[in-house]
Design a protein with these regions (language model features):
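Acidic, low-complexity terminal tails and accessory targeting/binding regions
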Residues: 1-3, 47, 82-92, 149-186
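Generic beta-sheet signal
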Residues: 5, 131-142
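Loop-to-helix element that buttresses phosphate recognition and phosphoryl-transfer chemistry
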Residues: 5-63, 109-122
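Short, well-ordered beta-to-alpha junction loops that form the rim of enzyme active sites
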Residues: 11, 55-57, 77, 121, ...
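Phosphate-coordination/substrate-recognition cap region in phosphate-metabolizing enzymes
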Residues: 39-102
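Glycine-rich phosphate-binding loop signature in dinucleotide/nucleotide-binding domains
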Residues: 45-48, 128-133
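Short glycine/proline- and acidic residue-enriched helix-loop micro-motifs
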Residues: 96-116
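GST superfamily/GST-like fold recognition
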Residues: 141-145, 175
Length: 186
């Protein structure tokens, strides 16, 4: 059983800075994002990971590399939410046409619905729980929030109540054999 699962959200991109939904578009890190990625490496110094899994998108892979991590494998299940018709739009832009829209409840036309994302997260959780030692997952804001919810056996929409900044570290673990969120958004 994985002793801890460290979640690393990729560092800043132009779209994340602007609040745009960035799903499958492969946006590079900003210069500031690269600096944050390097500083993540300082925070991870001395940590030993039995497995490091990354989203295949360059912003996640570059963040991992800058942080001194070597991706053991790329997982499509760690890709960001597929925003379909809403790719590149901000939430206010979407709500101008669809008042009250909430990603975690409503999903996205032409993209993923919450049960689709939950299924991806459940596959990742099953994989990492089988690993002996510490695991690192380097991916994206919404998928990591959803993954944290599924780790504690909560509905995927709980992720909509968790804020996760770019270039942050969160830790999933166990307390008395119960899955917990040990640290969040640090």
């Amino acid at each position: 059983m994985a002793e801890e699962v460290w979640l690393l959200r990729h560092a800043e991109t132009e779209w994340s800075r602007a609040g745009k939904h960035t799903g499958r578009t492969d946006i590079p890190l900003t210069d500031e994002g690269r600096e944050v990625g390097r500083k993540l490496g300082e925070r991870l110094a001395g940590q030993d990971f039995a497995l490091v899994l990354c989203s295949p998108l360059s912003r996640a892979r570059e963040t991992a590399k800058l942080a001194g991590l070597e991706c053991s494998g790329l997982r499509d299940d760690l890709l960001e939410w597929d925003y379909g018709e809403y790719e590149g739009l901000t939430t206010p832009e979407i709500r101008a046409d669809r008042p009250g829209w909430f990603l975690w409840r409503d999903g996205v036309p032409g993209g993923e619905m919450p049960p689709d994302v939950a299924a991806r997260c459940d596959r990742v959780v099953a994989e990492v729980r089988a690993v002996e030692g510490r695991v690192a997952l380097v991916a994206h804001g919404h998928i990591l929030r959803a993954l944290a919810a599924r780790w504690i056996d909560a509905p995927v929409d709980l992720g909509g109540r968790l804020h996760l900044g770019t270039g942050t570290v969160s830790v999933l673990a166990y307390e008395r054999e119960v899955a917990v969120i040990s640290r969040w958004n640090t």
